[in-house]
Design a protein with these regions (language model features):
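Formylglycine-dependent
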Residues: 221, 227-312
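Short beta-strand segments
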Residues: 127, 163, 216-218, 319-327, ...
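Active-site His/acidic residue clusters
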Residues: 278-290, 306-357, 393-400, 405
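Metal-dependent active-site segment of extracytoplasmic phospho-/sulfohydrolases and closely related
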Residues: 148, 357-398, 402-403, 408-409, ...
Length: 562
């Protein structure tokens, strides 16, 4: 009798696991449906209203438990049902046990770490969103928007003509870290992620194997390394400790990364909804985190800087930090001190005076970081990279800031030849004395072999793919279709000229880069026909379907702005 009671008790407990999974998935489906169709869901609730979903979940859990119990009661009808009735709870229990054990361990894909390099310098890569070089005094701007950085840059290597490789934060940061073009990784815009080898081939993984402690302080959903599926990358990311999940890694190995990422992402979404419904923590909103009042509600730049300083203070081993600030992200700005916008109301989007005040905020943050490092005596053993993700209004065919301060001011000066963000990782590895992997496309900017005529590729997503409709941030699925999906524009920069192919309208536009300080001689730039063939060949090499691009295409010369 007792063995049977014990068996029934074990089965009763085992039923809770599949019941939890079933109830959670149903809750997720309901929430996604109501939010998409009617504009309300768990995230929109607060106070006592959120407990409606808590009670709903309990009801779903009870229904699921009874449903599984009914299935199990029917096992007498056949051997298959008998086996499935026993196997489902057993497998569920094993799933939970294995998941907890996997969280306690490391990643199966992680290469064994080596000893740190002798006298390894610390590395900080810090960016602020949507920053134009032509709004900085060291690039010729008439306002002194960055008084501290202007002096600081005199001890650094400043790149006068630097360019991003992508017009959106995620694709820009991912290409910088991987050293691969977005056209190769297919990471253009969410929900695009790194896949296959791309998920493991990047600068953070290399530094981690060299013994670096690492942290990413950016923004969830858009730049977060694990939202981008950048595996084996950081020890801590966006205010949470990161432990690679062995179960997810095994699933990626045997069932494919798309399946593993989907399951991992689904479990995280379920967790965030349940924590919100039961009042444990608030659920974030991807759109609100990036714009408007959401920057105040969620982790703001003050919190990001404090997180960085705490990480630096606690570090004993060499550290690597990537920080992405959001104060200069439009279309509206919330500067802490208003010098240029004093007395004005921010009545329209993208007001220049408010933008310049936001840049002043970034300057103050940089001063705080550098002074803290100087006080901790780590400044002269740290490489500091200052850049942005793209230009204001997500532009790519203009100069963006790039300043690299090496330990003790080594290599200080101004670099006139064209640079791209794909060059950042190879440059850092070169300084460390590490050979650049074959999969990195950029060049070390410490090399004297950079041709002024090399072709820099940059991309932008299709226009109006992401829009705010009826107060909700949505992807216009009608525009995300084959053969180019999110990809809308492919640009090429050579010397002081830019060319950009509009993949939707099948038009090639070209012009000169405003403010370029090292133009090539007349006749050194290729003609538009050569560039359109180059772009089409580049897409073809990277397995894009280019059958819709019938050459020659229409061409439009754009008169440069003055």
């Amino acid at each position: 009798m007792r063995p049977r009671v014990f068996q029934e008790s074990c089965l009763a407990l085992a039923r809770l696991v599949p019941s939890f999974l079933l109830a959670s998935c149903v809750l997720l489906l309901i929430d996604n449906f109501t939010y998409t169709v009617f504009g309300f869901g768990i995230r929109k609730t607060d106070g006592t209203i959120r407990y409606f979903y808590a009670f709903l979940y309990l009801a779903l859990l009870g229904f699921s438990y009874r449903y599984i119990w009914i299935i199990e009661r029917q096992k007498a009808k056949g051997r298959v049902l008998r086996l499935s009735g026993a196997a489902l709870p057993a497998l569920s229990v094993l799933f939970v046990i294995f998941r907890f054990l996997s969280l306690a361990g490391g990643s199966i894909a992680q290469t064994a770490e080596t000893a740190p390099l002798k006298n390894s310098p610390n590395i900080i890569i810090i960016s602020t969103d949507g920053l134009n070089a032509d709004h900085l005094p060291m690039y010729g701007y008439y306002r002194n928007t960055t008084p501290f950085l202007q002096e600081f840059s005199k001890t650094a290597l400043l790149f006068e003509n630097a360019f991003t490789n992508a017009g959106n934060s995620g694709s820009s940061i991912a290409s910088m870290m991987t050293g691969k073009l977005p056209t190769a990784t297919r990471l253009i815009y969410p929900p695009d992620i790194l896949r296959g080898k791309d998920a493991y081939q990047h600068l953070p993984a290399i530094l981690r194997r060299l013994g670096y402690r690492s942290i990413d302080i950016s923004i969830r959903h858009f730049v977060d390394p694990f939202d981008l599926n950048m595996r084996n990358s950081y020890d801590r990311a966006n205010f949470r400790e990161i432990r690679e999940d062995k179960l997810i890694e095994y699933m990626a190995k045997y069932f494919g990364q798309d399946t593993a990422y989907f399951i991992d992402n689904t479990l995280e979404r379920i967790e965030s909804r349940l924590l919100h419904a039961y009042g444990i923590s608030s659920m974030s909103d991807a759109y609100e985190e990036a714009v408007g009042d959401g920057q105040k509600k969620y982790h703001n730049d003050d919190e990001r800087i404090e997180e960085l300083l705490a990480f630096i203070d606690a570090s004993t081993a060499p550290f690597f930090a990537h920080v992405h600030l959001m104060g200069t992200h439009g279309p509206k700005f919330s500067p802490k001190q208003r010098k240029y916008s004093s007395g004005q109301a921010q009545s329209v989007n993208w007001m220049v005076d408010f933008y310049d005040d936001a840049i002043l905020d970034f300057n103050r943050y940089m001063k705080k970081i550098v002074e803290n490092m100087r006080g901790n005596a780590v400044l002269d053993n740290t490489i500091i990279v200052i850049h942005t993700d793209h230009g204001r209004l997500w532009k790519t065919l203009l100069r963006v800031p790039l300043i690299i301060r090496f330990p003790k001011g080594r290599y200080a000066g101004r670099f006139e030849q064209n640079a791209q963000y794909l060059d950042i990782a190879p440059t850092l590895l070169d300084y460390l004395g590490i050979e650049k992997p074959d999969w990195m496309c950029g060049q070390s900017l410490l090399s004297s072999q950079i041709s002024p005529h090399r072709r820099i590729i940059t991309i932008r997503m299709k226009s109006k793919v992401a829009e705010v409709i009826d107060g909700l941030w949505q992807i216009n699925q009608a525009k995300v279709k084959p053969p180019f999906f999110h990809l809308g524009f492919v640009g090429v920069i050579i010397c002081h000229r830019w060319y950009e192919l509009d993949l939707t309208k099948k038009v090639l536009r070209y012009s000169e880069i405003k403010g370029h300080t090292s133009p090539c001689k007349e006749g050194d730039s290729p003609d538009p026909e050569e560039i359109e063939r180059f772009i089409v060949d580049h897409l073809k090499i990277n397995q894009w379907d280019v059958s819709s691009l019938k050459l020659p295409l229409d061409k439009i010369y754009i008169k440069p702005a003055r």
